[in-house]
């Protein structure tokens, strides 16, 4: 996952590579300005690691985006997405990909993204 943080008079803004741009919008919407949410998510990631190899899932429902993760994968999606990811029936050879509504990444990449944001925000605040 590629990402970049910038700081201006309007505050911090996260940007991600095209296939992960929903993560940037999630961070900009649900985390920036809500530091406690960041700490809660990082704490849940630690609980997830401690539970391994047992299955552990966590959901954070925000105002605009929801975050789902287990010990392997993280999913962020727009709350008003018409169909739940599990309910989508895809015909053979057809892929469902809506880069503006849902994105996936590994838990380790996601944790590095959050830690990099935390470090950046600590430097500029």
UniProtKB/Swiss-Prot annotation:
Domain of life: Bacteria
Pfam families in the record: UPF0231
Chain segments annotated as coiled-coil in the UniProt record: none
InterPro entries: UPF0231 (IPR008249)
Family statement drawn from the similarity comment of this UniProt entry: Belongs to the UPF0231 family.
Protein name from the UniProt record: UPF0231 protein HD_1708
Lineage, highest ranks first: Bacteria, Pseudomonadati, Pseudomonadota, Gammaproteobacteria, Pasteurellales
């Amino acid at each position: 996952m590629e990402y970049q943080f910038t700081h201006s008079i309007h505050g911090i803004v996260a940007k991600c590579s095209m296939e992960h741009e929903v993560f940037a919008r999630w961070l900009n919407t649900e985390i920036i300005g809500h530091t406690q949410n960041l700490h809660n998510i990082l704490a849940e990631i630690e609980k997830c690691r401690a539970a391994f190899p047992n299955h552990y899932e966590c959901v954070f429902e925000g105002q605009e985006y929801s975050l789902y993760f287990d010990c392997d994968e993280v999913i962020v999606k727009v709350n008003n997405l018409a169909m739940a990811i599990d309910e989508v029936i895809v015909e053979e050879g057809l892929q469902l990909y809506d880069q503006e509504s849902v994105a996936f990444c590994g838990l380790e990449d996601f944790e590095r993204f959050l830690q990099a944001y935390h470090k950046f925000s600590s430097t500029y605040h």
